[in-house]
């Protein structure tokens, strides 16, 4: 069943893209996100357009990488997982993930990076592997059309704010600055995904 929070967040996504001349219901666009398909906000949100190209996502358990997804194939697989009880990214059919992608546990020591993942996330080609924390930060900072946050925690602050000011110690290691975001649009489906000053800094840098 469709959650109202996701629907509201998606209406704002459509409006922001419309202002840039992009119709998210008819044009393919790239997305990174926080959440998984069992979550209300993320799961519902990632089914609100059949043109989503979800290149990377993470939740508290896994990191999902699909650097060159087929919109129709990935939409159908996300829908299948959404309808499974208590699903996780591990339920995603590995055969449907594009070359260079995969699903990795957040507890891994390090995650090897393929050329495809580095290109999709805008990571220096010389880097061969990242820790899960480093990779999740790279996902948040990826040069995509949309960063869709359906997670719990504050992931974006202003560069002149300290982590202590944010008051969310659990997310300190993942948090980035508004000036570091390279996405065109941020959708805050989660609660307090960015500090207000982080939003302002992102907007001042063209977001």
Where does each model-flagged region fall?
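Non-transmembrane, aqueous-exposed alpha-helical and coiled segments at domain scale
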Residues: 1-207
């Amino acid at each position: 069943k469709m959650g109202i929070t996701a629907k509201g967040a998606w209406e704002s996504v459509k409006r922001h893209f419309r202002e840039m001349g992009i119709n998210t219901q008819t044009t393919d666009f790239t997305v990174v996100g926080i959440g998984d398909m069992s979550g209300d906000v993320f799961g519902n949100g990632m089914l609100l357009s059949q043109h989503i190209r979800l290149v990377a996502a993470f939740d508290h358990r896994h990191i999902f990488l699909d650097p060159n997804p087929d919109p129709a194939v990935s939409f159908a697989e996300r829908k299948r997982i959404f309808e499974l009880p208590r699903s996780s990214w591990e339920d995603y059919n590995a055969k449907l993930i594009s070359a260079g992608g995969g699903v990795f546990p957040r507890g891994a020591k390090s995650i090897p990076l393929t050329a495809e993942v580095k290109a999709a996330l805008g990571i220096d080609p010389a880097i061969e592997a990242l820790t899960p924390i480093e990779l999740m930060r790279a996902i948040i900072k990826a040069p995509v059309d949309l960063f869709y946050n359906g997670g719990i925690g504050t992931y974006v602050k202003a560069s002149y704010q300290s982590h202590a000011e944010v008051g969310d110690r659990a997310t300190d290691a993942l948090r980035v600055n508004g000036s570091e975001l390279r996405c065109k649009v941020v959708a805050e489906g989660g609660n307090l995904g960015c500090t207000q000053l982080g939003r302002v800094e992102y907007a001042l840098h063209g977001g």
